[in-house]
C-alpha cells in the first residue's frame, strides 16, 4: 500500500491512519465495509480516497461512479464544499489531472446533476433512494425510471448512517444493498450505532467491520480525540436538569465560540431574539434552522464556517441552531449549550464541541420543560394517522422519542466528561434494547424489499412516506395575496420554506381567528387553468391560478401553499407567524432567472439517429461500465454478452418509427417546412422550432402519430426469447417499452414497408446482430411481459438508463455523436 499512502498524503497533506489504510485494502479487494469511527477522526477521507485512487490508476475492478449519501442537506453541502476545495488546488490538478471536475451535488436546493451523471455525486439520502425507487424527487413522472440504474455498478457511501429512520430510509438502504449484491461496493459510516446493530449488518450483508477501538495507536495519534495540552480531558459535561436552556446562562458562560442547539425551531428563534437584545455589541450572533429560504441558508452556512470552521480567523460569536448542524458540518466551539436528545443525536451534537486539535470544551445539557400554552396546538382530525401526528405535537421532546430522551439524560448525568469509551458505553446502555427492536422490525419487513419492488412497478411518489421519510411538510411561498388574487403564478419558480404540516395548521387556526379583514385570502393553492397543456410536473410552461383555501383544506397535504405575507414575518430569525408590514416575498430561484431554451429539433434519419446513439454509448458510457459488465456474469448466473444486448436495445428502441402511419405525418411536415419531398427517406426527427412551427405541426397532425416504443419492445422480445431466454427477453423488452415513460404497456397496429426494413437490417449487419423482423402485427398489451425476478428488474433499470440518456444526448447534440 506504499503507493496508496503516498497518494493519500499528496491529496490531504497527511499520512493516513492505520484504520484508513485498512478501509482501502478491504474496499479495493472487493469487500464492503461498515466503519465505526467518532466524529472528527477522518472517516470522510477514509471512504473517499479508495475511489479517487482507483480512478487515478484506472482500476477496472472498482466502480467508476461514487454516490455519497447523507441524511441532511446541510451535511451534503458542507462535505461537498470541503472535498471540492481540496481537489481544486492547482498542485492536485497538476499531479492528478484525472481527478478534475468529477464532482456534483444533488440536494433539494442544489440540482446541477439531476440525472446523476458525474463520477462523484454528493446527495441526500432522499435523493439517492428516490432515484433507486423510481420516483426521483426533482424529475417528472415520465422520467421516473431514468436514474435508478445509476446505482448499478456504483460505489455507495452512506455517511452518518445512524441518523436514518430505522424503519424507513435505513431499512430501505439495507434492502437496496441486498438487491444490488455484487453490482456495487459499499461503505457505511457511523459514529453512534450500537455494537449489536453493527454486528447485525455484518452478518446479514457480509460486511467487514472496522472500528477505531481496534486501532489503539490511531486513537493516540488522532489529535481531535486527544485533550488539550494543559487538560486531562477533552470535554466536560454538566447536566442542568432543573432549568431550560436560556439566554442568561449562554451569555454568562460565553468565551469565544458558543454553539446553542435546540430541538425545536421556535425555541431557537426565541433564544435568538432574546440574545439579540442583550448580547454585547461586538458579539456576532448567527442562527440556522429549517425555516429559511435556501439562498439565505447558504449564506448562513458560509458565515458559520468563517466563524466556527477549522481555519477560521474570526472570533467572539454565538450560533443558535437546531439539529441541522448536529452532524457533518466541520465546525467547533469551546462552549456548547444543548437541549437533551437521544444519546446518538446528543453525541453528534457534542462532536461540534472541541472538535479540533488542542481544543477543550464545556457542554451544558438541559432538560426540555413542559410546553407553554402557546405551543400546545389543539386540532381535530378525522384519520387515525393524522390523530397520531397531532398527538406527537404534545410531546415536549418533539421531534424525538420521550423515553429515549429521559433515559439519555439520566445516563448522561452519571458522567462529568466525554471520551470515546464513555460515548460507547452510553450508546450501548441507552440504545441497545431500542435498536434490537429495530433489528426485529427490519427483518420482519424484509428490509422493505417488497415496498421497493412495488415502487419499481408503479413509480409512485406517494411511496416516499413508507420507504424514505415520514415527514408531512408544507412548502410555504410568501406573496402579496391582498393584491394578487387573479395573478398568474408559476409554483416551481419560488424559493420556499418548509414547515411541518400540523404546526402550520395550528398557526393557521390562530391567524384565521385574528384576520385583518374577513375577506382576506390568507392561504391559497395553485391550480392550472382549464386551457392548460400541463403534462407531467411543476415545470410546465403554462401558468397556474390561485384558489382560496380554508384552514380545513390544509389538512389535505399540498406540496406548495401560497400565504399572505402580511400575516408572516421573515427576519434574521427566519419565518415566523407575526403580522407585519414588511412586505417580504419569496425570492425567485436562481435557476429560473435564466432564459428558458426554445424547444428545437434538427432533422435526422432513422439510421443517423441510431448511429448517433450507438456512438454516444461508445463515447460516454462504455469505458465507465467495465466494473459492472465484469460483475454481471456472477450476478445474472450465466455468461451473457450484455454489451451486445445494449447495442441491440439501441437499434430496436425506435423500431416503431418505421411504421408507415408514424412516418406519414412526419414526412408531410418536413416536406411542407422545407419544400423538399423525399418519399423514401426514413425519419427519426424532423426539423422543428417551437416558436415558428406549432401551427404547421397541428396541421400535419404530428401529435396524432401512433406511439412507437411498444412495437420495438415486442420485436426485441420475439428475437431474444429463443436466442437467449425469457428472462433476457423481458429485460430488453421492458427497457425499450418504457424508454419514454414507465407507464407504456402495449403496442399499436403497425405495418412497416420493405424499404424501411432494409434500414434496420443494415444496422444489424454493421453491429453483427441477428434477428428476423416482423413487418405487420395487430396491436396488443405487453403487460404480461414484465420483470418478475429481482435480477430482471435491476438489469432492466441499468439498461433503460443507458438507453434514455443516449437518446437524450444524441437528440440534443446530433452533430457531436453522428460519426460515420
Where are these regions (language model features)?
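Walker A/P-loop
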Residues: 30-50
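Conserved Walker A/P-loop ATP-binding site and its immediately adjacent core
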Residues: 44-45, 62-87, 193-197, 265
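C-terminal helicase lobe and adjacent C-terminal extensions/tails of nucleic-acid helicase motors
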Residues: 270, 277-283, 288-301, 341-580, ...
Amino acid at each position: 500500500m506504499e503507493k496508496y499512502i503516498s497518494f493519500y498524503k499528496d491529496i490531504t497533506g497527511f499520512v493516513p491512519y492505520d484504520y484508513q489504510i485498512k478501509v482501502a485494502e478491504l474496499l479495493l479487494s472487493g469487500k464492503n465495509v461498515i466503519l465505526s469511527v467518532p466524529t472528527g477522526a477522518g472517516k470522510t477521507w477514509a471512504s473517499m480516497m479508495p475511489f479517487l485512487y482507483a480512478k487515478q490508476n484506472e482500476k477496472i475492478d472498482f466502480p467508476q461512479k461514487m454516490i455519497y449519501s447523507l441524511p441532511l442537506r446541510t451535511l451534503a453541502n458542507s462535505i461537498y464544499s470541503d472535498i471540492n476545495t481540496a481537489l481544486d488546488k492547482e498542485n492536485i490538478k497538476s499531479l492528478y489531472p484525472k481527478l478534475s471536475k468529477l464532482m456534483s451535488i444533488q440536494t433539494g436546493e442544489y440540482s446541477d446533476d439531476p440525472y446523476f451523471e458525474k463520477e462523484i455525486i454528493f446527495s441526500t439520502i432522499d435523493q439517492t433512494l428516490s432515484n433507486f425507487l423510481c420516483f426521483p424527487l426533482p424529475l417528472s413522472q415520465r422520467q421516473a425510471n431514468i436514474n435508478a440504474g445509476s446505482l448499478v455498478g456504483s460505489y455507495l457511501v452512506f455517511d452518518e448512517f445512524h441518523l436514518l429512520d430505522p424503519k424507513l430510509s435505513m431499512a430501505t438502504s439495507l434492502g437496496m444493498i441486498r438487491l444490488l449484491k455484487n453490482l456495487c461496493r459499499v461503505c457505511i459510516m457511523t459514529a453512534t450505532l450500537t455494537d449489536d446493530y453493527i454486528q447485525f449488518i455484518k452478518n446479514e450483508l457480509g460486511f467487514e467491520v472496522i472500528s477505531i477501538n481496534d486501532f489503539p495507536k490511531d486513537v493516540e495519534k488522532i489529535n481531535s480525540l486527544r485533550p488539550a495540552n494543559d487538560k486531562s480531558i477533552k470535554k466536560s459535561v454538566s447536566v442542568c436538569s432543573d432549568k431550560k436552556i436560556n439566554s442568561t446562562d449562554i451569555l454568562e458562560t460565553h468565551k469565544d465560540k458558543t454553539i446553542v442547539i435546540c430541538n425545536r425551531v421556535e425555541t431557537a428563534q426565541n433564544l435568538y431574539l432574546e440574545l439579540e437584545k442583550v448580547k454585547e455589541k461586538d458579539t456576532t450572533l448567527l442562527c440556522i434552522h429549517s425555516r429559511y429560504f435556501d439562498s439565505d441558508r447558504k449564506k448562513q452556512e458560509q458565515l458559520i464556517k468563517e466563524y466556527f470552521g477549522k481555519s477560521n480567523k474570526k472570533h467572539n460569536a454565538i450560533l443558535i441552531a437546531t439539529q441541522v448542524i448536529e452532524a457533518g458540518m466541520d465546525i467547533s466551539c469551546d462552549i456548547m449549550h444543548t437541549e437533551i436528545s437521544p444519546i446518538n443525536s446528543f453525541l453528534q451534537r457534542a462532536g461540534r464541541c472541541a472538535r479540533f486539535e488542542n481544543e477543550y470544551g464545556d457542554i451544558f445539557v438541559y432538560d426540555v420543560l413542559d410546553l407553554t400554552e402557546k405551543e400546545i396546538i389543539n386540532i381535530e382530525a378525522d384519520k387515525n394517522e393524522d390523530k397520531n401526528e397531532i398527538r406527537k405535537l404534545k410531546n415536549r421532546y418533539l421531534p424525538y422519542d420521550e423515553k429515549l430522551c429521559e433515559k439519555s439524560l439520566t445516563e448522561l448525568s452519571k458522567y462529568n466528561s466525554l471520551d470515546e469509551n464513555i460515548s460507547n458505553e452510553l450508546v450501548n446502555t441507552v440504545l441497545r434494547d431500542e435498536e434490537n427492536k429495530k433489528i426485529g422490525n427490519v427483518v420482519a419487513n424484509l428490509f422493505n424489499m417488497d415496498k421497493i419492488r412495488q415502487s419499481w412497478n408503479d413509480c409512485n411518489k406517494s411511496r416516499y412516506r413508507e420507504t424514505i421519510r415520514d415527514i408531512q411538510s408544507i412548502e410555504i411561498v410568501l406573496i402579496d395575496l391582498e393584491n394578487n388574487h387573479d395573478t398568474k403564478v408559476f409554483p416551481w419558480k419560488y424559493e420556499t420554506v418548509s414547515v411541518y404540516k400540523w404546526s402550520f395548521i395550528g398557526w393557521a387556526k390562530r391567524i384565521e381567528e385574528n384576520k385583518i379583514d374577513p375577506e382576506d385570502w390568507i392561504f391559497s393553492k395553485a391550480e392550472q387553468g382549464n386551457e392548460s397543456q400541463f403534462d407531467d410536473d411543476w415545470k410546465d410552461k403554462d401558468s397556474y391560478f390561485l384558489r382560496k383555501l380554508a384552514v380545513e383544506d390544509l389538512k389535505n397535504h399540498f406540496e406548495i401553499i401560497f400565504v399572505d405575507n402580511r400575516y408572516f414575518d421573515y427576519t434574521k430569525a427566519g419565518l415566523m407567524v407575526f403580522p407585519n408590514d414588511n412586505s417580504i416575498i419569496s425570492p425567485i430561484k436562481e435557476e429560473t432567472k435564466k432564459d428558458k431554451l426554445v424547444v428545437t429539433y434538427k432533422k435526422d434519419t432513422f439510421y443517423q439517429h441510431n448511429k448517433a446513439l450507438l456512438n454516444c454509448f461508445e463515447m460516454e458510457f462504455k469505458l465507465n461500465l467495465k466494473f459492472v459488465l465484469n460483475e454481471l456474469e456472477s450476478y445474472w448466473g450465466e455468461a451473457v454478452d450484455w454489451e451486445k444486448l445494449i447495442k441491440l436495445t439501441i437499434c430496436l428502441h425506435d423500431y416503431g418509427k418505421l411504421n408507415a402511419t408514424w412516418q406519414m405525418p412526419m414526412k408531410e411536415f418536413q416536406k411542407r417546412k422545407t419544400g423538399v419531398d423525399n418519399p423514401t427517406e426514413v425519419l427519426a426527427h424532423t426539423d422543428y422550432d417551437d416558436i415558428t412551427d406549432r401551427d404547421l405541426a397541428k396541421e400535419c397532425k404530428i401529435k396524432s402519430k401512433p406511439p412507437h416504443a411498444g412495437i420495438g419492445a415486442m420485436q426485441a422480445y420475439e428475437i431474444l426469447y429463443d436466442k437467449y431466454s425469457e428472462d433476457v427477453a423481458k429485460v430488453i423488452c421492458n427497457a425499450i417499452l418504457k424508454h419514454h415513460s414507465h407507464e407504456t404497456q402495449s403496442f399499436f397496429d403497425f405495418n412497416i414497408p420493405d424499404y424501411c426494413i432494409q434500414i434496420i437490417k443494415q444496422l444489424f449487419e454493421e453491429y453483427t446482430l441477428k434477428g428476423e423482423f416482423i413487418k405487420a402485427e395487430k396491436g396488443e398489451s405487453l403487460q404480461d411481459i414484465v420483470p418478475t425476478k429481482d435480477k430482471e428488474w435491476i438489469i432492466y433499470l441499468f439498461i433503460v438508463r443507458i438507453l434514455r440518456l443516449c437518446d437524450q444526448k444524441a437528440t440534443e447534440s446530433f452533430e457531436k455523436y453522428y460519426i460515420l
